[in-house]
């Protein structure tokens, strides 16, 4: 399924063959590609990120566009299916002739696309893929979020400091690069700080029954459970843990960030914690302005994926303006030089490895609502 979203009223160009990164002709709309999980098991991620990107592009066009030209956002749905991201990104580059790519949320899907973007010298910005391997692909690959070595270390210290846990169990999705990586970084920091990881139970994304793993965790005597997975499994894990009488704290990373988490987990989510990139409760004028505009447009409160999607579009637009055109190498150089760009998820500075230096936000579930706990800065 593909959705082409044009904001300029221009006639769409016929399909083209071949690849390359020549700048868009002056006066024509600037074509920007986006790939996201708009359908399938992780659709909440893709839909939130897409809405944020859509809002940003709409605002940019209303303000006159970029370099005096409108932006045309061409969005492809990878259906949450492994392998599909590579297919749609090839299409965006070869047929649609986009000058840059925004996406994806999931690290495994960004990793599918990154070699293709790198080979074709098309800058790619991931809004929220936190696995460090994503940007290691090459110098055309960027992100506007923190990375998992930082997230894992902060989560480990949170377990010690706030949860008072000295012995933990891990529940890891072995089919997810994000989950495996975040588990590793958590484990390294937690054990370095004197804690014990009593056992690591494993599952595959899409599993529905976690009772065997949770029974083993219960028998281990773990004082907390770290589940670095996506919201689709996190909610079920919490439900089944409580059904088995496990009352210890359960916590996770930014993969938990979705309104559907509470819909899936219900009352079992009470008292759980997760790390993320921003909070809609932030009182800063920039955040509250974004929240108000997002609610007016989509009739819902924007989550972190929406905020990062929004920021990724603005970071790209800023780089194009500083580059003075849409040529791939020049936009790449401008992205690499991004410093203190003010967005709704904080100030974005791109480091030498094309990662963003950003703070981390902790959220909890209280009375069936997501509530802000604290912000930890690098």
What is the predicted role of each segment?
Residues 1-31, 62, 377-378:
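Short, low-complexity disordered leader/linker segments with a strong preference
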Residues 15-20, 44-51, 63-135, 203-210, ...:
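Beta-alpha junction/loop-to-helix N-cap segments that form part of ligand/metal-binding clefts
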Residues 24-52, 76-83, 105-106, 171-180, ...:
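Extracytoplasmic "Venus flytrap"
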Residues 85, 144-167, 180-182, 208-211, ...:
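Hydrophobic alpha-helical segments within soluble ligand-binding/sensing domains
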Residues 117, 182-275:
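Extracellular/periplasmic bilobed ligand-binding domains
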Residues 141-205, 224, 316:
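An alpha-beta-alpha
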Residues 238-310, 324, 364-377:
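Extracellular/periplasmic periplasmic-binding protein-like sensory domains
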Residues 296-306, 317-370:
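Segments of small-molecule ligand-sensing domains
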């Amino acid at each position: 399924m593909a959705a082409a979203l044009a904001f300029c009223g221009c006639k769409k160009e016929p399909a083209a063959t071949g690849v390359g990164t020549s700048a868009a002709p002056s006066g024509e709309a600037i074509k920007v590609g986006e790939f996201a999980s708009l359908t399938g098991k992780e659709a909440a991620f893709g839909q939130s990120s897409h809405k944020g990107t859509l809002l940003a592009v709409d605002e940019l066009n209303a303000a006159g566009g970029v370099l005096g030209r409108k932006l045309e956002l061409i969005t492809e749905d990878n259906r949450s299916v492994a392998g599909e991201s590579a297919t749609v990104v090839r299409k965006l580059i070869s047929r649609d002739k986009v000058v840059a790519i925004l996406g994806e949320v999931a690290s495994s899907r960004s990793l599918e696309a990154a070699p293709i973007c790198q080979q074709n010298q098309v800058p790619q910005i991931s809004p929220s893929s936190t696995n460090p391997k994503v940007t290691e692909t090459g110098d055309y690959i960027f992100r506007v979020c923190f990375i998992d070595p930082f997230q894992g270390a902060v989560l480990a210290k949170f377990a010690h400091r706030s949860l008072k846990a000295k012995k933990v169990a891990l529940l890891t999705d072995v089919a997810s690069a994000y989950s495996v990586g975040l588990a590793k970084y958590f484990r390294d920091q937690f054990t370095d700080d004197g804690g014990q990881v009593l056992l690591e139970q494993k599952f595959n994304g899409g599993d529905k029954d976690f009772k065997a793993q949770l029974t083993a965790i219960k028998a281990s005597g773990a004082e907390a459970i770290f589940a670095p997975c996506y919201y689709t499994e996190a909610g079920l894990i919490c439900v089944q843990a409580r059904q088995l009488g496990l009352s210890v704290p359960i916590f996770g990373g930014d993969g938990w960030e979705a309104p559907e988490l509470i819909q899936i987990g219900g009352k079992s989510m009470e008292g759980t914690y997760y790390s993320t990139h921003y909070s809609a409760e932030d009182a800063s004028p920039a955040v509250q302005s974004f929240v108000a505009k997002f609610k007016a447009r989509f009739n819902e409160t924007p989550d972190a994926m929406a905020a990062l999607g929004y920021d990724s579009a603005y970071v790209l637009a800023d780089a194009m303006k500083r580059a003075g055109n849409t040529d791939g190498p020049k936009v790449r150089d401008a992205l690499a030089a991004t410093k203190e760009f003010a967005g709704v998820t904080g100030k974005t500075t791109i480091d030498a490895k094309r990662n963003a230096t950003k703070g981390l936000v902790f959220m909890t579930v209280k009375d069936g609502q997501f509530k802000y706990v604290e912000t930890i800065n690098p």
